[in-house]
Design a protein with these regions (language model features):
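Short beta-strand-to-turn element immediately C-terminal to the catalytic PLP-Schiff-base lysine
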Residues: 4
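Outer-membrane beta-barrel pore domains
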Residues: 7-145
């Protein structure tokens, strides 16, 4: 269940709660709480979200938290610059091998009414001791019909 508020033009806030009940009485129910706030102005947008995920794998105390910050800006008639930062952590480090921060940045070019291409760069920064950062380049394509 969730609720969205738009108190001002361009400003949006959302809260969501989800419950996934375990079919096994010896295991815990999974719970997810997500919040979002964002603003869209003329030629730009910014947003942030926070997520709390309780009892991952139906195990009591296997809790994860994550947050993201992102934005975009028009830099030309058909070009948009965008960036995003994500962070995932676990309570007491139980999931350290999968914990990481990540950065994504790129440009999106609108080539026609139904065609967009977006080259982007991604950097993944694992939190585990001795883990190396990963660097990736992508090109995303959109074809609408």
């Amino acid at each position: 269940m969730g609720a969205t508020l738009t108190p001002l033009k361009g400003l949006s806030m959302r809260i969501y709660y989800g419950l996934n009940e375990s079919s096994d009485e010896t295991k815990k129910d999974k719970q997810n709480l997500a919040t979002f706030i964002g603003y869209k102005g003329k030629g730009f947008s910014i947003g942030a979200e926070y997520n709390l995920y309780k009892n991952d794998g139906n195990v009591k105390g296997n809790n994860l938290t994550g947050f993201s910050i992102y934005g975009s800006a028009q830099v030309g008639k058909s070009t948009e610059l965008y960036a995003r930062y994500d962070d995932l952590s676990s309570k007491d480090g139980w999931n350290e091998a999968k914990e990481e921060s990540a950065i994504l940045a790129g440009l999106q070019f609108k080539l026609g009414k139904y065609v967009k291409i977006a080259p982007n760069f991604r950097m993944s920064m694992p939190k585990a001791d001795g883990a190396d950062n990963r660097y990736m380049g992508y090109v995303s394509c959109y074809f609408g019909f």
